[in-house]
C-alpha cells in the first residue's frame, strides 16, 4: 500500500521529526525484521489538542512510511484499532479488549505485515493469578493483559514469537508477578527455542526488579543508551518542552541479532507529540 512519492514527500517535510538514522531503515531486507513498540495513548476526549482525532493520521502515516514487520501497540481502544486496520492495508492484527476478552477496554494488539509474515497461532492471557480468566491481578488497579503470537517469516521460513503487554501503573506486586508470569509463559510455549520478541509499556524504569527479570533473560535493545542521552526517555506526557526523561517502553529479544535500535520523536502538523510515549524501534536479523 506504500506510495514512494508520498514517502519521500512526508519524510522531507518539516512538520515532524524522524531520526535520520531511520530514514534508511524503511524497507526490511530478506532476513531482517523491523519491530516497533508504541503506546499510542487511548482516545481520551479530555486530552484537548492532543486528542486522538488530531494525532491518528500522523500515527498511521508514520507506519506507512517505515513499513515495519511487527508493531506491539498499547492503550488501543476498539475504534482506534478499526481506524488503523482500515488505514494500514498491508497489516493485520491480533488481540482483544482487556475488559471482556472481545472489544471492550484497551487492547495490547500485535499488528503484523501480512505480506511478509504468516500468523501461526495467537492468544491473550490476563496478568493475574488466573490468567485464563478476565481478572485484575494482585494489587493492580486495572485488568492487564499480554497478547502473543507465533509467526512464520515468509522469505526465510523462520518461526518466531512476539509477546506484547502493558503493565499496571500502580501495583508493585502486580508488576513483578506479571514479569514472572510472562517469562514462565514463554518458557512453556517456546519448546523449540525459536526467537522471541517482547514489546510493551512496562510503566517501569530499567533499575527496577521486574525489568531486571527480562534483562537477565533477554536483550534489552536500548540498554546501552546513556541515561544523559538526548533521546534516552520514552514518556513525555504530551509536554512539548520535554523529550521524555523516563525510559518505560521496551523491546526485548532473544535468538536474534540486533542491528539497529532507537527511540523515535514523532510529531504532528501542529508541533505536538503524536502520542505521550515515543515509539521504540529496532531492526533484527535472524541468526544463520
Write out the residue ranges for each language-model feature.
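Active-site beta-strand/loop signature of hydrolases that rely on acidic residues for catalysis
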Residues: 34-40, 59-84, 111, 149, ...
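Extracellular/periplasmic catalytic domains that process cell-envelope and extracellular macromolecules
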Residues: 28-30, 64-65, 87, 101-104, ...
Amino acid at each position: 500500500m506504500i506510495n514512494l512519492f508520498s514517502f519521500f514527500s512526508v519524510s522531507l517535510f518539516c512538520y515532524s521529526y524522524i531520526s535520520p538514522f531511520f530514514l534508511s531503515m524503511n524497507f526490511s531486507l530478506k532476513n531482517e525484521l523491523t519491530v516497533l513498540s508504541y503506546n499510542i495513548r487511548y482516545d481520551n476526549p479530555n486530552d484537548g489538542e492532543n486528542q486522538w482525532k488530531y494525532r491518528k493520521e500522523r500515527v498511521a502515516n508514520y507506519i506507512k512510511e517505515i513499513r515495519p514487520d511487527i508493531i506491539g501497540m498499547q492503550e488501543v481502544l476498539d475504534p482506534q484499532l478499526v481506524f488503523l486496520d482500515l488505514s494500514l492495508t498491508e497489516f493485520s492484527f491480533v488481540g482483544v479488549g482487556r475488559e471482556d476478552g472481545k472489544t471492550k477496554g484497551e487492547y495490547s494488539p500485535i499488528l503484523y505485515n501480512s505480506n511478509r509474515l504468516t500468523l501461526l497461532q495467537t492468544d491473550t492471557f490476563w496478568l493475574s493469578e488466573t490468567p485464563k480468566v478476565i481478572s485484575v491481578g494482585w494489587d493492580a488497579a486495572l485488568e492487564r493483559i499480554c497478547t502473543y503470537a507465533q509467526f512464520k517469516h515468509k522469505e526465510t521460513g523462520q518461526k518466531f514469537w512476539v509477546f506484547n503487554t502493558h503493565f499496571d501503573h500502580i501495583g508493585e506486586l502486580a508488576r513483578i508477578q506479571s514479569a514472572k508470569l510472562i517469562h514462565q509463559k514463554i518458557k512453556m510455549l517456546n519448546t523449540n527455542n525459536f526467537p522471541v520478541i517482547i514489546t510493551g509499556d512496562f510503566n517501569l524504569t530499567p533499575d527496577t526488579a521486574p525489568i531486571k527479570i527480562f534483562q537477565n533473560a533477554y536483550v534489552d535493545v536500548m540498554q546501552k543508551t546513556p541515561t544523559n542521552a538526548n533521546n534516552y526517555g520514552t514518556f513525555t506526557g504530551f509536554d512539548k518542552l520535554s523529550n521524555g526523561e523516563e525510559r518505560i517502553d521496551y523491546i526485548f529479544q532473544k535468538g536474534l541479532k540486533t542491528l539497529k535500535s532507537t527511540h523515535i520523536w514523532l510529531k504532528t502538523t501542529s508541533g505536538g507529540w503524536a502520542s505521550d510515549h515515543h515509539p521504540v524501534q529496532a531492526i533484527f536479523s535472524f541468526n544463520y
